[in-house]
């Protein structure tokens, strides 16, 4: 009898060992993905959270109209697992979108537009030059926010001294860690691709104007920066857009948006095509 009990205990120990090894194997070798593609925004876009003046109409996402002093934001409704606390792994991701900034005058445009990554409970922040994403030009680690800005209005307290409109990468501050001068083509559709390589921590931004009639001007821009996402943002985040106006203004619209992330060492998948 004792021998049988010993055999049973040994069997269960072996079984438990195999089970735990299998779970660990799949945990380490599986990949968690999040994907969605919005080619046309519906009036009742259920996978978006609107904040401030953001809304959808006529197949597009409108963040602000061309009126003074507005803040509009839109977030993807499902939180994104951007890094894993257990494994330390960080997700690779790529997002692409098309947007239009349309102002009554191409000389008086404000304030700009951002794609951002922020805590799940993120709320609209200060408007105007802070673009609805930040509250300070000083580095604030409690912000836990990374943004790519398309800045149309010069703010002397933090913008590049050349006073040019620019694309910027922001980490916990409205003062960009890297910028690229940008020639806004008022009313023209811009295509943007933002990619993050977890192996190198490099965030790459590319903007092109595919239908530009301004042959003498630059119509393609690329910006890179090392951003240690795991050290900046929470494990779970929301992604979205924000735009603001001030004394000067413009309409800020998004016409399409797709996103795909892959996080190794986890075990779930979320996908929504043309959501």
Swiss-Prot record:
InterPro entries: ConA-like_dom_sf, L-lectin, Lectin_LegA_CS, Lectin_legB_Mn/Ca_BS, Legume_lectin_dom, Leguminous_Lectin
UniProt KW keywords: Calcium, Lectin, Manganese, Mannose-binding, Metal-binding, Signal
Transmembrane segments: none
Domain of life: Eukaryota
Entry PTM: The mature form consists of two chains, alpha and beta, produced by cleavage of the immature protein. These remain cleaved, yet fold together to form one subunit.
One Pfam entry name: Lectin_legB
GO terms assigned for molecular function: D-mannose binding; metal ion binding
UniProt binding sites for Ca(2+): 151, 153, 155, 159
First and last residue of the signal peptide: 1-30
Residues binding Mn(2+), per UniProt: 149, 151, 159, 166
Site-annotated residues for Cleavage: 210-211, 217-218
Annotated propeptide span(s): 211-217, 270-275
Chain sites annotated for binding D-glucose: 111, 129, 246-247
Quaternary organization: Heterotetramer of two alpha and two beta chains.
Family: Belongs to the leguminous lectin family.
Further comment found in the protein's record: Binds two manganese (or other transition metal) ions and two calcium ions per heterotetramer. The metal ions are essential for the saccharide-binding activity.
Stated role: D-mannose specific lectin.
UniProt-recorded name of the protein: Lectin
Source organism per UniProt: Lens culinaris subsp. culinaris (Cultivated lentil)
